[in-house]
Amino acid sequence: EHTVTSVDTPSEALAVSIGEHGRVDLPYMAELLGSPGDYERITTELQGVIFKDPSADADEPEAGWQTADEYLSGNVRNKLRMAQLAAESHPEFKINVEALTKAQPKDLEASEIDIRLGATWLNPAIVQQFMMETFQPPYRIRYNNLIQVRYSPFTSEWRIGNKSAAGMYDIMSTETYGTHRANAYKILEDTLNLRDCRIYDTIEEDGKERRVLNQKETMLAQQKQQAIKDTFAGWVWQDPQRRNLLVKQYNELFNSTRPREYDGSHIHFVGMNPVSYTHLTLPTTERV
């Protein structure tokens, strides 16, 4: 087995570097070209084929270089933000910004996004707004913020405080979106925590108490639960400002990744020493 000791072009040096080291190794590539330490020729000729990661050490010109297929994949939204920040003080990163801008995934529109109650990325303020607008609690509750939605990222649990504050005579809470056994706020809390609402009775048997499922009340409560889900599905996109905010947030969180793409086309390099390296391949993103 022969070892390549020299090449004629940066493109050939890149092919050997990837084949031998699995990465863009500028010192090794410069050695192959017979000009140790001369990285400028390589980076200039391979502009757009390799990219320097802005997070790499700026004092090490040979560090942090990646092939285009590697750099322009993964979380390209985060990478674009980093490149834009770097380009403000280092104009050489403008090429990164241009390439990453073209690599951004197409934004999903509201009609392509399904947001359900219980999604942990939802801002509790949005759920609070839905709850107030839909259940329409008495003025004293709204004015004093007596019933509040909270989410704990530590326990991944949603909580609605003071669920009984609306009272048993509040029609929206106990009839329209809830029952007398489980009011709307209790059902909403179950829904946020992805639980089916269940109603239990406590009975005494042989001197001991035990809980048994009340099927009739449970069925009624689950009908109200479905009504709340359906109402939210229609409500969430109604307000244009809220819609734009949620679409942007969803795309940032869940539509930021670009898969790494290999074309598979063969590039043949000739003139390298020894002859055994006359067939080397690179993705077309690395062709020059």
Predicted segments with their positions:
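Pre-P-loop entry segment of helicase/translocase ATPase cores
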Residues: Q238-Y277
